[in-house]
Amino acid sequence: MNYHTYFGRESAPVECCIVGTGGFGRSFIAQSLKTPLISTRVAVDLKAQTATDVLRGLGIDPSRIAQCATASEAKTAWENGHYIAAGDLSVVLDLPISVVVEATGHPEAGAKHCRLAIDAGKHVALVSKEVDSVVGPGLALRARNNNVIVTPVDGDQPSLLMGLVTWAEVLGLDIIAAGKASEYDFVYDPKQRTLSSNGKTASAHDFGDWIEPATLDLSTIAARRSEIAAEFPQRAVPDLCEMTLVANA
């Protein structure tokens, strides 16, 4: 795929608002500072000061950052070319932003943010799988009725799996199963005969017998490996959320 067919040299930057300035949000702003066709001048968190601190930490001149508590303040700051830090999404929804990136990871707050954004005519990039797995289909319908889009973000495991499955279906292949990697890796040490995961190590004397087992029955192999690794959590909430996204797709 040639991305220049989607983003021509004369394209205007997409104006974004990030909601949630934690790990993902901070990284998104940092990347947008280096990406010509993405502009993220608006950051929202529980406290405007939190968003301000993130913007400053990314090297943005403090004199160019405005903390805004009202829509009027946000409008003035935008017109003056400032970055905007707010503690309430509703304060910034009248600005000429095209996409709200929801990255709080909080189910109730995230659902509210999506509803507000959709009703304001903004597209939503829904990073918070905790939201998408519960109310994603409903949000998608609401967005469709408002002529905007709600979408998972490309590059995360759910979107990659959706792409792989639909690619296979277009080729005419029958999909009999789909899965994803766990949040944590399991590392087997054949010399010590131990299994390690997420900072914990445990004895796994029989695990080596199931690396290249004599049986080809996959269900038996998976069950035995799971039994040997019983001391470790093998499913996490993010795993379940992400697979629900794929199932809903």
Regions found by a protein language model. Name each.
Residues 104-120, 127-156, 161-167:
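Rossmann-fold NAD(P)-binding glycine/threonine-rich loop
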Residues 166-249:
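Active-site-lining helix/loop region of Rossmann-like oxidoreductase modules
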Residues 55-56, 136-139, 162-165, 186-193:
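Short acidic, glycine/serine/threonine-rich loops at helix termini
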Residues 16, 20, 43, 131, ...:
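Catalytic cores of large soluble enzymes that bind and process phosphate-bearing ligands
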Residues 1-116:
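N-terminal glycine-/serine-/threonine-rich beta1-alpha1-beta2 phosphate-ribose binding loop
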Residues 58-62, 143-145, 168-170, 193-196:
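Short, hinge-like loop/turn segments at secondary-structure boundaries
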